[in-house]
């Protein structure tokens, strides 16, 4: 049965006479943006490997996007390795917007890290967002929106450890004691494009936090089928989920993985930059090309392509994740306000406190004077066709499908 929770009516009286406040059609009706602070790492493995994927086909591949890399302190041999990985992603990531990458070469402050990456920012509630309540990595958000949402900053930021024992010969054949830079960049660009959780963990209290879930987070499921993005935050319940078993629920990835939900890397001891944001090491480390997004790269191990599983997961990120299980009735939307304009009103509100546990599917803004309703997924809502000099009262209701 459908559940609806209404917020008490609030009045908009007399304000339309003078239109003292002009409805902020922009930027209020565009999108929200937050900085990206979580990094996805790839660590240096210790097991000498001869695992090598087949070289990319020599035929001309269709270019689906353009990447522009800003190099900071990179040696010439390394630039060629980076460009090779960029060319692979250009043929596999579809976007009409140039993906700018800020890449830095220097010693890592973390022992064992080969490379790290993060998106430039996260965006939500933009036109084209499959789920406006989730936060999309810059490059993915731009691809879905069809425009650059932040022209002042790069879409991806990558740092590479210059002190690692790299194969500098450019022959694509690292020895059993060398690491392949192209493979590291193939991995890190994946993080920058959105293969990344926005969670955090407090090891002292065992608390997990996920204040701004990404679509990546929304596709992660606990063993009992709950979405990671729907668990209370901060909470020990979320902390337990981050350090036990999580699987991917996207249909494309399940199909690519032989009908099995891919298992994610969630060790009992949480590892910042590795936990949650990688495929499980034990499950996929020997799976050839599908081990690209495991948390470590062994010496001698190389990849020339993302692999079917990673590409399927990236495709899932472009769709709306399945709705989670509602465990609560929707509470009222909070902090409703009305901004007036000429013959119009902009109604803004915040989601109810139990947005996740109630699985809110839409909001209904009702003009109590006329009886007309507007359904929306996000705030604010622009109401037009009002008569200047007339008082109006509106209500806002939250609804889920349970």
Regions found by a protein language model. Name each.
Residues 361-365:
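Short beta-strand elements bearing conserved aromatic residues within extracellular beta-rich modules
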Residues 327-337:
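Proline-enriched interdomain boundary motifs that mark the N-terminal boundary
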Residues 372-378:
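Short beta-strand segments within Ig-like beta-sandwich modules, predominantly Fibronectin type-III
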Residues 342-360:
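Conserved aromatic anchor
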Residues 29-186, 192-326:
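Extracellular zinc-dependent metalloprotease catalytic-domain scaffold
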Residues 91-93, 351-356, 400:
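Extracellular acidic, Ser/Thr/Pro-rich low-complexity tracts
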Residues 383-402:
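Beta-strand-rich modules
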Residues 2-28:
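Secretory targeting and sorting signals
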């Amino acid at each position: 049965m459908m559940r609806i929770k209404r917020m008490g009516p609030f009045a908009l009286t007399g304000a339309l006479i003078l239109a003292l406040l002009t409805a902020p059609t922009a930027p209020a009706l565009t999108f929200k943006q937050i900085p990206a602070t979580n990094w996805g790492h790839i660590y240096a493995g210790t097991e000498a490997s001869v695992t090598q994927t087949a070289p990319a086909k020599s035929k001309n591949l269709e270019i689906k996007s353009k990447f522009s890399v800003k190099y900071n302190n990179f040696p010439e041999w390394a630039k060629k390795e980076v460009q090779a990985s960029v060319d692979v992603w250009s043929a596999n990531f579809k976007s009409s917007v140039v993906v700018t990458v800020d890449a830095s070469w220097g010693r890592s402050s973390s022992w064992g890290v080969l490379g790290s990456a993060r998106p430039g920012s996260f965006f939500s509630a933009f036109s084209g967002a499959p789920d406006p309540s989730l936060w999309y990595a810059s490059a993915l958000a731009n691809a879905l929106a069809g425009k650059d949402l932040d022209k002042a900053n790069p879409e991806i930021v990558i740092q590479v450890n210059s002190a690692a024992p790299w194969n500098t010969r450019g022959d694509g054949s690292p020895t059993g004691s060398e690491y392949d830079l192209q493979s590291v960049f193939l991995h890190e660009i994946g993080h920058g494009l959105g293969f990344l959780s926005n969670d955090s963990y407090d090891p002292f209290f065992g608390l997990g936090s996920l204040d701004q879930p990404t679509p990546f987070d929304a596709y992660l499921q606990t063993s009992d089928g709950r979405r990671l993005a729907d668990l209370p935050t901060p909470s020990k319940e979320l902390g337990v989920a981050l350090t036990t078993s999580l699987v991917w629920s996207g249909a494309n990835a399940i199909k690519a993985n032989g009908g099995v939900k891919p298992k994610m890397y969630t060790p009992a001891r949480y590892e910042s930059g590795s936990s949650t944001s990688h495929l499980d090491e034990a499950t996929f480390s020997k799976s050839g090309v599908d081990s690209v997004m495991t948390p470590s790269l062994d010496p001698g191990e190389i990849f020339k392509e993302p692999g079917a599983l990673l590409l399927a997961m990236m495709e899932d990120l472009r769709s709306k994740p399945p709705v989670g299980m509602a465990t609560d009735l929707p509470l009222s939307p909070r902090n409703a306000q009305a901004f007036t304009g000429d013959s119009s009103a902009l109604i803004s509100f915040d989601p109810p406190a139990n947005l996740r546990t109630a699985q809110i599917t839409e909001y209904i803004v009702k003009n109590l004077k006329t009886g007309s309703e507007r359904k929306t997924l996000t705030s604010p809502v622009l109401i037009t066709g009002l008569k200047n000099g007339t008082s109006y009262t509106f209500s806002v209701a939250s609804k889920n499908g349970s």
